[in-house]
Amino acid sequence: ISVQHVNLFQTHIKPCTDCKYCHVHNGCPLHDSFENIAGKLDEADVIILSAPVYYLGFPAPVKAFIDRTQQFFVRRILFKREKMAHTKQGVLICTCGGSDLSAIEALKAPSEMFFSVFGAELSETVYLAGTDLTPEERRCNRMELIEKEMSK
């Protein structure tokens, strides 16, 4: 088993400008570390996307990377210029400072689309909310959730 870890916060991936280059050509006119990372995802059997939640969304470096996968969506899904096998597993791991579990719902659609352009299905989601809370606050939140479940 080989594992490769990429910290998108340590890359300088330019954001997609919606120039439509990928509608006519394979690839993107923006050249940065995106190509190398995307190539690794193409070769992977399992893709794990792990990120904190910022304002019900992915942080800027992750969002920029996901947006740049538009070229694969256009090539593989929209225009079907490239065949793709759906044989991979996608795993989403997120942390959220707040305790609102609705944040995970906001990330599911972009995550599913992201995984799909690499031939993966979102097979597992791991979500840890309340990371900004103290241990006592987390305990109280758990007790509130248990009480809500028991009152149903």
Q: What role is predicted for each listed range?
A:
Residues 78-123:
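Short, glycine-/small-residue-rich phosphate/pyrophosphate-handling segment
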